[in-house]
Amino acid sequence: MLLAASVDDVEMMRILLAAGADPKIQTATKASTIMAATALNHGIGESLVTEAEAIDAVNLLLSLGVDPKGETTVGENALFGPAYRGWNTLLAQMIDLGVNVNAVSKAGTTPWRAANGQGDRLGGVLVNTEGADLLVKHGADPKLGVACESQNRCRDLK
């Protein structure tokens, strides 16, 4: 179920559900199927999945009672993937569902830093000003976390 969710394959998710798969399953690090569907562990260019497909997968999981508000053992939640990828419709949906806009990962990244190009992922990340502004509008504190420069993990965005 996690693999199907991570590629937002709604058809396969429905097949697995019909066969008894648990939509609330999590990884060892507590990543949920919703986190997988919101591209928590994907960088730009790693997947051909579209934001619309991700929204369809997330909506299916929400209809099955999967809680969108969880955090992994490293402190990431369902806002990080959309913030990194520039999926602002999905980002807004997760914010509206009450996902913590001020989550701070063990690497010092927040959803705001991820959107602003200051996250801890090397390569394949964009500067998502609209997403960063959306997060601030909903209470994100830009002072939280640690900029990638202090981690020596910045991408060359030039």
What are these regions (language model features)?
Residues L122, V127-K158:
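Terminal, low-structured helical/coil segments at or just beyond the last alpha-helical repeat
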Residues R14-D22, D56-D67, A92-N100, D133-D141:
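Ankyrin repeat domain, specifically the short helix-to-loop turn at the C-terminus of the second helix
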Residues L3-D9, A36-A54, G81-N88, A114-N128:
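Ankyrin repeat A-helix N-terminal signature
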Residues M1-G20, Q26, E71-T73, F80:
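Extended amphipathic secondary-structure runs
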Residues A28-A31, T50-N59, T72-E76, F80, ...:
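Eukaryotic tandem repeat interaction scaffolds
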Residues M1, Q26-G43, E71-A78, V104-G119, ...:
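Ankyrin-repeat boundary/"N-cap" motif
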Residues K30, A54-I55, G108-T109, N128-A132:
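Amphipathic alpha-helical segments in well-structured domains
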